[in-house]
Design a protein with these regions (language model features):
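Conserved AdoMet
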Residues: 26-104
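Short helix-capping segments at alpha-helix termini
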Residues: 17-18, 130, 152-157, 250-257
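Conserved SAM/SAH cofactor-binding pocket of Class I
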Residues: 93-192, 197
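Non-catalytic nucleic-acid substrate-recognition regions in nucleic-acid-modifying enzymes
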Residues: 1-21
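C-terminal catalytic and target-recognition region of SAM-dependent MTase-like enzymes
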Residues: 232-275
Length: 275
């Protein structure tokens, strides 16, 4: 069977996807270890039987709802490719605004803390774009291992490292100029209603407690001992709860200039506190 025939078969096989042909193209390129442009330009080329079998399996996973990023093992974020697996959330485009806000603030070799780092997308992106020293924490040893590998692959491991720990606990007694956190913020009661792609992601990276802000309450209690001068705090949350998080942040830091920053879609997504 030819490349073009396999692409047509794959498109039909992932019909449950919102973008079946695009997904089939990605999966076929992955199965054949080729670029997408090659697939499109070489429709008459034959496909080896082993590669065809592999492609069928990949399509079955996608049709069952598994996210493309988990199948391919990589996800794009802020112009770079990050290794991902089911021990971490898949980086979201809306989270890139946290990086942009941090970049506007960072001047020189400041110290940055990324709490709940996951695959290290935020931390590694900041380290790649600035001379800052970036540390990250995560409760999951598997996430920290993955983030460490991403830092190595991106060439920033000399200034970007990660530790296993609960929120900022591993860095108690240290001071930071930028603290960024994208903690679990989905209310527990909302988890069963989430669409299939999210159901493949680790629950502990999604569950924000009864109102989605449980971990942020704890983090805000820890932050006063971690702040250097000047300092920027960036916290991502869901649009329905962002106002409450902003009020909590203002209460924790009465002298701070607290604002809500929209994401690329114009949704209120980030609390920004300048101290």
């Amino acid at each position: 069977m030819s490349v073009a025939e396999q692409l047509a078969r794959g498109t039909a096989a992932v019909a449950s996807s919102s973008s079946p042909r695009a997904d089939a193209l990605l999966l076929l390129a992955y199965a054949l270890r080729r670029e997408r442009a090659w697939i499109l330009a070489n429709g008459e080329a034959p496909v080896l039987e082993d590669d065809a079998r592999n492609f069928v399996g990949l399509c079955a996973r996608r049709n069952a709802g598994e996210p493309i990023a988990y199948i391919l093992g990589t996800a794009g974020f802020y112009g770079r490719e990050f290794l991902v697996n089911q021990s971490v959330l898949i980086p979201r485009p809306e989270t890139e605004h946290l990086v942009e806000e941090a970049l506007r603030f960072i001047a020189g070799p400041m110290r940055v803390l990324d709490v709940g780092t996951g695959c290290g997308a935020i931390a590694c992106s900041i380290a790649a774009e600035t001379p800052a020293r970036v540390d990250g924490t995560d409760l999951s040893p598997a996430a920290v291992e993955l983030a460490t590998e991403n830092a190595r692959r991106l060439g920033v491991s000399d200034r970007c490292s990660f530790q296993v720990g609960d929120l900022a606990e591993p860095f108690r007694g240290k001071r930071f100029h930028v603290i960024v956190a994208n903690l679990p913020y989905i209310p527990t009661a909302d988890l069963p209603q989430l669409p299939d792609p999210i159901s493949f992601e680790p629950r502990e990276a999604l569950d924000g407690g009864s109102d989605g802000l449980t971990l942020y309450r704890r983090l805000l209690r820890e932050l006063p001992t971690l702040l250097d001068t000047p300092c920027l705090v960036l916290l991502e949350a869901a649009p329905p709860t962002i106002g409450v998080l902003a009020e909590m942040t203002q209460t924790a830091f009465p002298s701070a200039a607290v604002s809500i920053v929209p994401d690329y879609a114009g949704l209120a997504r980030c609390v920004k506190a300048s101290l």
